Amino acid sequence: SILFGYQRFLDNYLKNLSIEQCQKNHASKDCYNLNTYNNLDQRISLVDSLIHDKKLRKRYLERFIQEEIIYAETVKHLKHTSTLINKYNFSETEKKRLNSLINFQSSLIVNADLKKVKIISQDLQKHDLEDVMKKKLSVIYSWSIQSPSHHKLRIKKINELKAKYPNIQFIGINIDYNFPDQWLDAISKYNSNIDNEFMIAAEEHAPFYRNYLNKVIFLNKDCIVKKSEIILSNIEFDKHIEDFIASQ
């Protein structure tokens, strides 16, 4: 449709403009990574100044603010985004939802402690994350049975990473907590190595889990978050792992 085509054009325009502005202000920075807090904050500012149609403006602001929360790494980031939620004319329901997402993200930012996060093993027993980490540097990644083609690519990527970085523990966490049987079927069907495959236990923020698909969290040996804004498809993923190992 014409509207869809226009929105796609607008999406690309905002992306390109955010890259241009980043390059202008930060010559040494990697400005092409769009999945960062800073890039999303830049795009929110662009929407605020350039888009005046109420419906389009609302749609973009809600979307970019939600993504900005998910890529936030610090308390300062979340406080800034909280002011944006109050600044724009969102409904009370939407404000409540976004503030709830901030609350959830605050448990995943850098230096957050994930020892007591509840996960479910393949015998359907509940465990604390710290119990399966074996005091190793770990990379946690989330996935869903509802994306089978992506699941196959993920397995290929993870197997390559396991071979390259044998001292890192790669832990897969499935988000389909309502479908344990389908999860078990998927890991036995697709995975040659089913060690370190778990399912998240549902809690009050369960409706947000799907927003975190593809995100990767780097944990030190004490189950503390050291990096949380990376996605598995990042072209510099190896560099992020090497920097992580060197910093520990």
Where are each of the predicted segments found?
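Oxidative protein folding and maturation machinery
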Residues: S1-L124
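Short acidic, S/G/P-rich loop/turn micro-motifs used as interaction or catalytic elements
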Residues: I69-A72, I145-S149, Y177-N178
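Short active-site neighborhood of thiol/selenol oxidoreductases, capturing the structured segment around
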Residues: H127-I158, Q169
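Loop/turn elements at helix/coil->beta-strand transitions in domains of secreted/extracellular proteins
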Residues: K134-S138, Y165-Q169, S192-D195, K221
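Structural microenvironment flanking redox-active thiols in thiol-disulfide oxidoreductases
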Residues: S149-K189, A201-A206
